[in-house]
Regions:
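Electrostatic cytochrome c docking/interface patches
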Residues: 1-33
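Sequence context of c-type cytochrome heme-c attachment sites
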Residues: 13-16, 42, 83-85
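Short coil/turn linker and secondary-structure boundary residues
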Residues: 21-24, 60, 98-101
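Short pre-active-site segment immediately N-terminal to redox-active cysteine/selenocysteine motifs
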Residues: 25, 33-36, 44, 92, ...
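Gly/Gly-Pro-rich "capping" loops immediately C-terminal to redox-active cysteine motifs
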Residues: 26, 30, 42-71
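Sec-exported extracytoplasmic/periplasmic mature domains
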Residues: 34, 38, 42-45, 58, ...
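Axial heme c-ligation environment in periplasmic c-type cytochrome domains
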Residues: 48-56, 73-102
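C-terminal capping alpha-helices of c-type cytochrome domains
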Residues: 63-68, 91-117
């Protein structure tokens, strides 16, 4: 199967998003991100170790984000845009072993950060 740059690679074919933000889910995601993500990622567009998260939900589909944060290794190997980021950041994102619930919460936290109300 060929690599789909809109979907990524992993178990998520679609991710249902509410029209409005799920505040409780975003709060859980913020907690998970604080443990697993924010040592390398800022919530702005500034690079820390990895790229900043600002605008990611506008650039990427929900399923791409969910697949990437739960299954980064094959996507780093196959996605040309991720490979370009790797040349800038120089560090491969390690698999953080996120649960489905944590990954979905982190996606909601990213949506909140990008201004979804």
């Amino acid at each position: 199967a060929s690599y789909d740059p809109k979907r990524g690679e992993g178990k998520y074919d679609t991710v249902e998003l509410g029209a409005t933000l799920d505040q409780a889910l975003a709060t859980k995601g913020e907690e998970a991100a604080g443990v697993k993500c924010t040592s390398c990622h800022k919530m702005t567009d500034e690079k820390l170790v990895g790229p900043g998260w600002k605008g990611v939900t506008e650039r990427r589909t929900p399923q791409w984000i969910m697949n990437f944060i739960t299954n980064p290794d094959p996507m780093i190997d196959k996605d040309p845009e991720v490979q370009a980021q790797l040349e800038i950041c120089l560090v491969r994102m390690p698999n953080q072993g996120l649960s489905d619930d944590d990954a979905r919460g982190i996606l909601e936290y990213m949506r909140k950060n990008d201004g979804v109300k």
